[in-house]
Curated annotation (Swiss-Prot):
InterPro entries reported for this sequence: GMPPB_C (IPR056729), Mannose-1P_guanyltransferase (IPR050486), NTP_transferase_dom (IPR005835), Nucleotide-diphossugar_trans (IPR029044)
Name of the encoding gene: Gmppa
GO biological process: biosynthetic process; GDP-mannose metabolic process
Notes on the domains: The N-terminal substrate-binding domain adopts a Rossman-like fold and has a binding pocket for GTP or GDP-alpha-D-mannose. The C-terminal domain consists of a series of tandem hexapeptide repeats that adopt a beta-helix conformation. The beta-helix forms several protein interaction surfaces involved in assembly of the GMPPA-GMPPB mannose-1-phosphate guanylyltransferase complex. A loop extending from the C-terminal domain (C-loop) is involved in interaction with other subunits of the GMPPA-GMPPB complex and may be involved in allosteric inhibition of GMPPB catalytic activity by GMPPA.
GO cellular component, as recorded: cytoplasm; GDP-mannose pyrophosphorylase complex
Protein name: Mannose-1-phosphate guanylyltransferase regulatory subunit alpha
Family in the record: Belongs to the transferase hexapeptide repeat family.
Residues annotated to bind GDP-alpha-D-mannose: E87, Q256
Native source species: Drosophila melanogaster (Fruit fly)
Positions of the UniProt region annotated as Substrate-binding domain: 2-260
Subunit structure: Component of the GMPPA-GMPPB mannose-1-phosphate guanylyltransferase complex composed of 4 GMPPA subunits and 8 GMPPB subunits; the complex is organized into three layers, a central layer made up of 2 GMPPA dimers sandwiched between two layers each made up of 2 GMPPB dimers.
Gene3D superfamilies (UniProt xref): Hexapeptide repeat proteins, Spore Coat Polysaccharide Biosynthesis Protein SpsA, Chain A
Function: Regulatory subunit of the GMPPA-GMPPB mannose-1-phosphate guanylyltransferase complex; reduces the catalytic activity of GMPPB when part of the complex. Mediates allosteric feedback inhibition of GMPPB catalytic activity upon binding GDP-alpha-D-mannose. Together with GMPPB regulates GDP-alpha-D-mannose levels.
Region annotation C-loop: where it falls in the sequence: 373-402
Disulfide links within the chain: none
Length: 438
């Protein structure tokens, strides 16, 4: 038996994903018509030995229970139990696993997967599991690894490993100088003995906590709970060079979802994966899937996802890389490319939407133009990953990026919105360029 753990953090995480995360938890943001971590769950469910998937974070239970209920119903026939375990406070990337160790160990699984909730990938979980089980008995963790450019590697966990055995000899999280172009993908398979290591860290932290609390009178002086454990720095780094940490390099597509701009890039790749795994989800032939009459949607340039409840005028043109959410209305002559349109949005007649995300319940008037600047990886650099630049450059000016409309934004007719970010519930009255509209 196998289990999987998906780590999703909490509300104070994912701030760079605003304004999209202001009304929807980042792990539930839809990519290619499915919530982000639904893709993780789908990958885990492909493994015949998976019996339970645990989502660990500190989002309120009320924000996650609807999604978990939907997933449980979807995979009930596969005999997979899906649960959300809410941390009482932020416990770090490994603290939550240790806190819920009894739930993870219940049923005596032979190993369990750990997936960071903010990564997007074509997850080769079966290959990762097979690789791990062929390692020596001392192996505790196997990391899924990929290559990045020399400069970009500094933004990730870097590892040095033996290419024949996979044994990791050195691991550094976000090094200040070059270590290796092989990086940590945030996907792991762990032996159950890893909890012995976590227990040692927890108890040593307890002694440190007690000492600091005594010296400081009350708190421990750093604002962290005793159970707060950093997976990368406190677990992986010490395991390197002990023949207990291994890595499996993969050529598969992989990306992090850190900023709103990276959502469009991830959306494109998940739509591309559908062609291989779920072609029935795509509207690439211009036919609305799930409709009894098989009526023509509109002109489609693959790959495009259209929710069955969306209304699209036959003269509209969609794609490539477009996802249309539930209840969306798209009027005559509309052109949408490289964009995500969320539920209940309205795109009125002859509007152009390029490299943008249109928030839930937003309306764009007729003959308007909403356009952003793509932030894709450099196609001329092998292994290049998504750049996640800050909002502002060194001169204090807004960096060009995709255009984002928060929920329930009103864009009037015949206006232009270029490289701008609009916070929720704003009613615009003029055109904007390179601005954040508060």
């Amino acid at each position: 038996m196998l289990k999987a753990v998906i780590l999703i953090g909490g509300p104070q995480k994912g701030t760079r994903f605003r304004p999209l995360s202001l009304d929807t938890p980042k792990p539930l943001f839809p990519l290619a018509g499915r919530p982000l971590i639904a893709h993780h769950i789908e990958a885990c469910a492909q493994l015949p030995d998976i019996r339970e998937i645990l989502i660990i974070g500190y989002y309120p239970q009320t924000q996650m229970e609807g999604f978990v209920g939907d997933m449980q119903a979807l995979y009930s026939s596969s005999n997979i139990n899906i649960r959300y375990l809410q941390e009482f406070t932020a416990l770090g990337t490994a603290g939550g696993m240790y806190h819920f160790r009894d739930q993870i160990r219940a049923g005596n699984p032979r190993a369990f997967f750990v997936l960071n909730g903010d990564v997007c990938a074509d997850f080769p979980l079966q290959e990762l599991c097979d690789f791990h089980e062929k390692r020596p008995a001392s192996a505790l963790v196997t990391i899924m690894s990929t290559e990045a450019t020399r400069q970009q590697s500094l933004h990730y966990g870097c590892l040095v490993f033996d290419r024949s055995s996979g044994a990791v000899s050195h691991y550094v999280e976000k090094p200040s100088s070059y270590v290796s172009t092989f990086i940590n993908c945030g996907v792991y398979v762990c032996s159950m003995d890893i909890f012995t290591v976590l227990a040692q860290i927890f108890h040593s932290r307890g002694q440190e906590y007690s000492c600091q609390a005594f010296c400081n009178g009350n708190g421990n002086g750093n604002g962290r709970e005793q159970g707060h454990i950093k997976w990368e720095q406190e677990v992986l780094t010490p395991l390197a060079g002990t023949d207990k940490l291994f890595a499996m390099p993969v050529p598969n597509w992989w990306s992090q979802l850190k900023t709103a701009g990276s959502a469009i890039y991830a959306n494109r790749h998940y739509l591309g994966l559908y062609k291989k795994t779920h072609p029935e989800r795509l509207a690439n032939v211009g036919i609305k899937r799930g409709e009894g009459d098989g009526s023509l949607i509109c002109t489609v340039h693959p790959d495009v996802y259209v929710h069955p409840s969306a209304t699209v005028h036959h003269s509209a043109v969609l794609g490539p890389n477009v996802a249309i959410g539930p209840g969306v209305t798209i009027g005559p002559g509309v052109r949408i490319r490289e964009s995500i349109v969320l539920e209940q949005a309205q795109i009125l007649d002859h509007t152009l939407v390029l490299h943008s995300i249109v928030g839930r319940g937003s309306t764009i008037g007729a003959w308007a133009r909403v356009e952003g600047t793509p932030s894709d990886p450099d196609p001329n650099k092998p292994f290049a990953k998504m750049e996640n630049p800050p909002l502002f450059n060194n001169e204090g000016k807004l960096n060009p990026s995709i255009t984002i409309l928060g929920c329930f934004v009103q864009v009037p007719a015949e206006k232009i919105l270029l490289n701008s970010i609009v916070l929720p519930h704003k009613e615009l009255s003029r055109s904007f360029k390179n601005e954040i509209i508060l």
